[in-house]
Amino acid sequence: MGFGFDLTFYCMPSKIRILPEHVAQTIAAGEVVERPASVVKELMENAIDAASSEIVVELKGGGLQLIRVYDNGEGMDREDVPVALQRYATSKIKKAEDLYAIHTLGFRGEALPSIASVSKMTIKTRVANSISGTKAVCEGGEIKGISEVGCPIGTEVEVQNIFYNLPVKRKFLKSIRSELRYCLNHFLRLSLSHPSIAFKFIHDGRMLHEHLKTESPLVRIEAILGRETVTHLQVCEFDDGEIRILGFSSLPSISKGNTDDIYIYVNRRFVKDRMIYKAINETYRHVLSTGRFPIAILFMTTPPYACLLYTSDAAD
């Protein structure tokens, strides 16, 4: 029985397809892992959240060939390892309200699975109450094997050949020197805000940075920015019972040609806030020449509910 119009249009197969899970994960991983420095940042944050007192970052070829981060933190139980490699698997939050009570650097549960999706990754981890550890081997987001292994307490994550399965993205990475600089920036930012942790940074077998643990933020600042810089810093403190600020800012006697040495932290998380940058630079406007900027390290501590963390995949 006809109705005067062609029904074949409604029977045509759809051109829209739901992507396979591994393809979707690889695309999503590109938002979290932009370059080797993203891996360094995510793995260092995981190590810090694991209550580590020592963290070592080792790179080869600016992180293009190899990134290895190992710590002496809490480690993971064998049964937790495959779970940690799934997206949105995290021990940091359980419900939306927990976003207002976060005390850790990581919370989205995307670091390990995202890194695994775009590299060849090996994890070795062991908890204190176990005589042996667990080793997981992943390639392109697929777990190739999980086995028992001898290793110290803590976690070691080795990432090789980043973006080997995304050649176009790898092509747009910069030179080894540039990628190394990006990695160092994240290393120094995290090292600066966690003086009670010892850090090492090794590139192509050469120790570039070694920071001993200390309870003094000023000692860590000196280790990173230099003794001469520290002698030209003034201390500022503020505490109203809810918000606490500890700041170190340069005297007009020294300045920089860029804002690279302005470090702002909220609850030990490095942030870039235009209003704070503008306020700092405005303070120095009448004492520094045009095009010159101060050195400033600002640590702000607030209740977790006072600031909403950026929950995007590409959060920095």
Describe each PLM feature range.
Residues 1-5:
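Low-complexity, intrinsically disordered Ser/Thr/Pro- and acidic-rich segments
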Residues 8-9:
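Short, positively charged and aromatic/hydrophobic N-terminal segments
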Residues 12-308, 312:
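N-terminal phosphate-binding caps/lids of nucleotide- and nucleic-acid-binding domains
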Residues 314-316:
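Positively charged, low-complexity/disordered segments
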